[in-house]
Regions:
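Structured core elements
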Residues: 3, 97, 108-110, 137, ...
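Active-site gating/interface segments in enzymes
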Residues: 37-38, 45-49, 86-88, 126-178
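Conserved active-site and cofactor/substrate-binding residues in soluble primary-metabolism enzymes
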Residues: 12, 72-80, 93, 112-115, ...
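Hydrophobic alpha-helical positions that pack around
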Residues: 6-117, 123-130
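Short, surface-exposed connector motifs at secondary-structure boundaries
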Residues: 1-2, 101-104, 222
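Acidic, glycine-rich active-site loops and adjacent beta-strand->loop/helix elements
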Residues: 8-10, 140-143, 242-243
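Flexible, glycine/charged-enriched surface loops at secondary-structure junctions
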Residues: 1-7, 29, 93, 129-139, ...
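Ferredoxin-type iron-sulfur electron-transfer modules in oxidoreductases and energy-metabolism complexes
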Residues: 160-174, 184, 188-224, 228-252
Length: 252
């Protein structure tokens, strides 16, 4: 059974794909709730099938969609697979969204994998006149990472390039945690970032295991919700990284 999940704020896309797949047995187009991060694979599995991916799979490692009989594929992967079966040509180009307040001509552009960010930026008119470039983000605004320079290549997993001016890229000054719990409310996986941060500071492996730190999907919702402007998502990433490293070493 194949389920094509599309957020409900794209009704034309839902109608089109429903029409195109009407005669296909075992194919269902499903409208999904408009909430972030709806595209996370574990969220998709639960929304589309009602199945919950376990924290720990049969192998003893973190659970995967396959543990509940599901395979998640994004649109690009499915399209590329179809083209490969027809032509034998693998994934050699990537569609990249170039956006931000510092880019002259924001647009979607298809480029060969390996193209330098610098060349992609030039193809979009370069940096706006009179604007000082502050930061280049590869990926989206919530989960993307900062590039040290424009001399980095587009990889197959890159789907966005954001250019921010120095003003837009300026980081807010963090203040002390006020323990308001908004990071807990924002977490789609039901984690407790404020508690996990303390467990990580104490390097408490057992506590991090009990708090299910390995379920973090790095969506950035906790940082976005934090009124104290603390780098909560980065701390979660460090905590998960440390926990997984200890787990590989046989930590208990």
């Amino acid at each position: 059974h194949c389920i094509i999940g599309i957020e409900r704020n794209k009704p034309e896309c839902i109608d089109l794909l429903t029409s195109l797949t009407r005669e296909m047995k075992g194919v269902e187009v499903k409208g999904l709730p408009m909430r972030y991060p709806q595209g996370a694979e574990k969220t998709l599995v639960e929304t589309c099938t009602g199945r919950e991916v376990p924290q720990v799979g049969p192998s003893g490692k973190p659970g995967l969609p396959a543990d509940v009989g599901c395979v998640i594929m994004n649109v690009t992967s499915v399209s590329t697979l179809g083209k490969f079966l027809k032509t034998g040509i693998p994934l050699v180009t990537k569609r990249v969204t170039v956006e931000g307040d510092a880019i002259a001509r924001p647009q979607n552009i298809e480029v060969p994998i390996g193209t330098l960010y610098r060349d992609v930026i030039d193809a979009c008119g370069g940096v706006k006149e009179g604007v000082e470039l502050g930061k280049i983000i590869f990926g989206g605004p919530m989960m993307g990472g900062a590039a040290p320079s424009a001399d980095f290549p587009v990889l197959k997993q890159n789907n966005g390039l954001l250019l921010f001016s120095k003003k837009a890229a300026a980081l807010p000054e963090p203040s002390a945690c006020i323990r308001c719990g908004r990071c807990i409310e924002a977490c789609p996986m039901g984690l407790e970032p404020v508690v996990i941060a303390q467990d990580f500071a104490n390097k408490d492996f057992a506590a991090l295991k009990a708090r299910c730190v390995d379920l973090c999907v790095a969506c950035g919702s906790c940082t976005y919700a934090c009124p104290a402007k603390r780098p909560v998502s980065q701390t979660m990433g460090l905590a998960k990284g440390w926990y997984m490293a200890e787990l590989r070493k046989g930590g208990k």
